[in-house]
Amino acid sequence: MGQKVNPHGFRLGITSEFTSRWYADKQYKAYVGEDVKIRKMMSRGMERAGISRVDIERTQGRLRVDIHTARPGIVIGRRGAEADRIRGDLEKLTGKQVQLNILEVKNPEVDAQLVAQGVAEQLSSRVSFRRAMRKAMQTAMKGGAKGIRVQCSGRLGGAEMSRSEFYREGRVPLHTLRADIDYGFYEARTNFGRIGVKVWIYKGDIVQSRAEREAQEALQRQTRRERPRRGPRSGSSGTTQGGTEAGRAAARGERRGRGGGGGNAPAETPAGEAAATEPTAPVAEPATAAASAPAEAASAPAEAAVANTPEKAEE
């Protein structure tokens, strides 16, 4: 039954959020009626603005309205005249102080509501419904969507009997709760009657809510900017120059080779090797002295005997 239910309502609290955020006890009925009137007011006369959704948040004595649009310049108007008019109409309707925020949709190609509006506008302009659907699908897939389904229902092509046709590209898991499915619906008014356009766009699987994911992405961007730069590297091993004993010895050898001309000067022995060879010298000296003393004593009588030979006496 995944294709029968509204994807936004099916995933509330999992991957999607409420578009109306307020609490009411006895005034619940009045608040719901006001929300419906506010959204109808935003849709009338603002077809060219490309409004994706309207978020409403109520506090005590105040009302905040967030308009997500692909063309904020049309909603704001020249020098903010259109925004002031909308704010005045909302205050007259609700009788409360209204805070109006106009937010731009960064990637309108993968926004289901805006895609549905675009297809409906083409149908109203007598464009072939198959061409409009395929063009919208190609644009969404190039924009980063992982799957899309577009459905048109009504008197397609001016036929006497109404029917429904849909095209799908990629993967659109309608019954997977962790799937981020965006859904949009819009009606096209043609000479033959109204044609309903429905769009499902699959953007990937998520476990966290959308607000938590945006906060995490902002934190990652901030840590990338604050990451310190590393020092210069030398050699294939990736260690910094002078960071190890071998590196310092090699650097000293290079400096001596440059100064002595020709590079034949021997490199200094590392401090660790010199310390290891020093204790062996004093240990070997006493043994050498003891071995040489008897040899000198034995050679003394031999020299005296040579001196007393007849050849020496004749001389």
From Swiss-Prot:
- Disulfide bridges in this chain: none
Q: Which GO terms describe its molecular function?
A: mRNA binding; rRNA binding; structural constituent of ribosome
Q: Which GO terms describe its cellular component?
A: cytosolic small ribosomal subunit
What the entry lists under InterPro entries is as follows: KH_dom, KH_dom-like_a/b, KH_dom_type_2, KH_sf_prok-type, Ribosomal_S3_C_sf, Ribosomal_uS3_bac-typ, Ribosomal_uS3_C, Ribosomal_uS3_CS
Q: Which GO terms describe its biological process?
A: translation
**Matching SMART domains:** KH
Q: Ranges of Low complexity compositional bias? A: 265-315
Q: Where is the composition biased (Basic residues)?
A: 222-232
Q: Which Pfam families match?
A: KH_2, Ribosomal_S3_C
- Has keyword rRNA-binding? yes
For the region Disordered, give the residue spans: 211-315
- PROSITE patterns membership: KH_TYPE_2, RIBOSOMAL_S3
Q: Which UniProt keywords are given for this protein, alphabetically ordered?
A: Ribonucleoprotein, Ribosomal protein, RNA-binding, rRNA-binding
Nucleotidyltransferase listed as a keyword: no
| Family of this protein | Belongs to the universal ribosomal protein uS3 family.
Tell me, how does this one assemble? Part of the 30S ribosomal subunit. Forms a tight complex with proteins S10 and S14.
Q: What does this protein do?
A: Binds the lower part of the 30S subunit head. Binds mRNA in the 70S ribosome, positioning it for translation.
Its recorded name reads Small ribosomal subunit protein uS3
Origin species: Frankia casuarinae (strain DSM 45818 / CECT 9043 / HFP020203 / CcI3)
Q: What gene is it encoded by?
A: rpsC
